[in-house]
UniProtKB/Swiss-Prot annotation:
Enzyme Commission number: 2.7.7.56
The protein's assembly and partners: Homohexameric ring arranged as a trimer of dimers.
Gene3D superfamilies according to UniProt: GHMP Kinase, N-terminal domain (3.30.230.70)
Alphabetical keyword list: Nucleotidyltransferase, RNA-binding, rRNA processing, Transferase, tRNA processing, tRNA-binding
PROSITE patterns: RIBONUCLEASE_PH
This protein's name: Ribonuclease PH
Domain of life assignment: Bacteria
Binding locations of phosphate: 87, 125-127
GO molecular function, one term: 3'-5'-RNA exonuclease activity
Pfam families attached to this UniProt entry: RNase_PH (PF01138), RNase_PH_C (PF03725)
Organism from which the protein derives: Pseudomonas putida (strain GB-1)
Stated role: Phosphorolytic 3'-5' exoribonuclease that plays an important role in tRNA 3'-end maturation. Removes nucleotide residues following the 3'-CCA terminus of tRNAs; can also add nucleotides to the ends of RNA molecules by using nucleoside diphosphates as substrates, but this may not be physiologically important. Probably plays a role in initiation of 16S rRNA degradation (leading to ribosome degradation) during starvation.
Record has Lipid metabolism as a keyword: no
Biological-process GO terms, alphabetical: rRNA catabolic process; rRNA processing; tRNA processing
Length: 240
């Protein structure tokens, strides 16, 4: 089996995390997984949704979108169509669930964190790149809140989180699929994990033949290997 990119089966794409990419948001990152590029921002606003009023905890919610020409052919903006597509809704819910799992909401205080992930160039793995980049932006936003005198109850961050894709390509488990692999893979799996080694979400779909238990275990092992490398990259970015 030869991957289109020439990478080894267990090799990540080149990953770059650029902090403070925009000047207005409390946290902002440009994350690059190979040719996939996503701008992730975290904005802080006072108050919480109505269903959390008086409960003494904060909230985090996420939105996701793709620029019209982030792909090979221009896609119509969802705003001009008047509604979000099912894929968009699924991905932004995944991003929100994943990031909320990193936080103790009772320590946030009466604030809402708005996470925005905008894909400026897509080459596979946009949802996993969004989660990985948004986590770093979230850390920067929390630092800003603390500097402003917030987080009196302590640090709400329980652990780092990151995400990566794995799949079965030409009968072999591979790590971090780009678009040519993703479009031809027999199985596509998106994995979200904590830096403590726990799983937050595993999304898997067979595109044709079912995958076997040994395939699933091989893909999870690759995801864990890749995730350890990604956590190191996140920490290195935050140390700059």
């Amino acid at each position: 089996m030869k991957r289109p990119s020439g990478r080894a089966a267990d090799q990540l794409r080149s990953i770059r995390i650029t902090r403070n990419y925009t000047k207005h948001a409390e946290g902002s990152v440009l994350v690059e997984f190979g040719d996939t590029k996503v701008i992730c921002t975290v904005s802080v606003e006072n108050g919480v949704p109505r269903f959390l009023k008086g409960q003494g905890q904060g909230w985090l919610t996420a939105e996701y979108g793709m620029l019209p020409r982030s792909t090979g052919e221009r896609n119509q903006r969802e705003a001009s169509r008047g509604k979000q597509g099912g894929r968009t809704l699924e991905i932004q819910r995944l991003i929100g669930r994943s990031l909320r799992a990193a936080l103790d909401m009772s320590k946030l205080g009466d604030i809402t964190l708005y996470v925005d992930c905008d894909v400026i160039q897509a080459d596979g793995g946009t949802r996993t790149a969004s989660i990985t980049g948004a986590m770093v932006a979230l850390c920067d936003a929390l630092a800003v809140i603390k500097k402003r005198g917030g987080l009196k109850a302590g640090n709400p961050l329980k652990h780092m989180i990151a995400a990566v894709s794995v799949g079965m390509y030409q009968g072999e488990a591979v790590l971090d699929l780009d678009y040519p692999e993703d479009s031809a893979a027999e199985t596509d799996l998106n994995v979200v994990m904590t830096s403590a080694g726990g799983f937050i979400e595993v999304q898997g779909t067979a595109e044709g033949a079912p995958f076997q238990p040994e395939d699933f275990n091989a893909m999870l092992a690759l995801a864990q290997k890749g995730m350890n490398e990604i956590f190191e990259l996140q920490q290195a970015a935050l140390a700059d």
